[in-house]
Amino acid sequence: LEQRSELVPYRKIMWLSLPRLCLERVFSFLPDRDRKTAALVCHQWHNIMRSPSLWRHRHFHFSGRISKFRKPHYSSAIAYVSHLGAYLERLEVTVCPPRKTQSALRLKGAITRLFSELIRVKAPLRSLAVMNLELDRSAWTTSLRASMVGCLISFLQRGSSKLNSICLSGMRNCIHQGLELLSALSHYETRFYPRCYISSLDLEAFFSGSVNVYLNSSVPDNLSQLQCLTDLRLSYSCLSDELLMALQDDNTLQTFSLHCCLKEPHQQLVCGSSWATLASSCPDLKVKISVNQVVNNDRLARMLLPEIPLSEYCMSAFYSPNEDWSPKPLLSDILPQYRHTLQHLNLDLNNFGESLDEELLELVKVCERLVKLSICAFLEIRTVARLLDMTLTQRSSLKEIHVRRNSNVNLTLHTQ
């Protein structure tokens, strides 16, 4: 007991004597409530808690709903920006899409006040994300949509001059308002270039799912104004030959991610030569494509052209045995085109009535650079064993395998 009592003050002294840098690192993992408690321990900890490095990143969730038992999330968000916004460099706002106009009105008011406060305190934002607004919902009236878009445009005109990463995924604008925002982005870059420029842009589901964006030439024109773009994420409905030509002008693109889903336009024709020119203009380019519920091999072949430098492919396909579709052509004919570039493969298939074991094994065998495989499908146990054997005995590049056979069986394998 005496030894234990001697250890307690010793441990306290050790904590109090830790260097400032170590304490900042430890405190960065604490939630706000624990940070408040830690700030009361001593003067040193109180001073460290005022360090800007602890308050540079923040994520808020806005719902627009009212609770009888606690304050709305946006109240604490606005208070945070008022007191600590001068340190804020990375801000993420995730929205729960409103079902009623009253909720949409509250959301609009909260986001407007948040951005007004960011402008007032001159927050040095480098990264901004506003996700899942879904302005095509009926809860958003015409005036509310216009007000929300105007709020974002106003922030781009009057807010931080240091932004290099912007995410507006899930916004679902009509074509007119979407183009207004894209124009504001290009004007933002024109104002501050070369002192500051946008290098990362996420516009997945930026336009409403019913819009044939690829028919509008203003989208490539605006994106071509972003001269140092290295990371771009779009919905497949935006893809066109004109867009690929616009992206090759500055030779900076390194990661190009495309998301395609059944309910959005995806039947446009894109020339393989356009992809080849882009790949030659941007030698470090890696293309990532995710496909959701497109169960038509002709459409998949039209999208997955051999000229694409595809490094990552994700697909979810839920189909009944009665449907006239099989993933076998995808596994045996289409994906082997990328044997020299494919690094990550993620497949979620409910192949109730057919075996895909041999096709999958052959695909893994021919893909020279495949590092990670994630698959949710009906596979035989011996297939998993053969996959592991490949990684151990055949000098395969495959280092990580995730297999889920059903809701009750999960297997993760890591190899060195």
PLM segments and residue spans:
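The conserved beta-strand core of Leucine-Rich Repeat
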Residues: 1-416
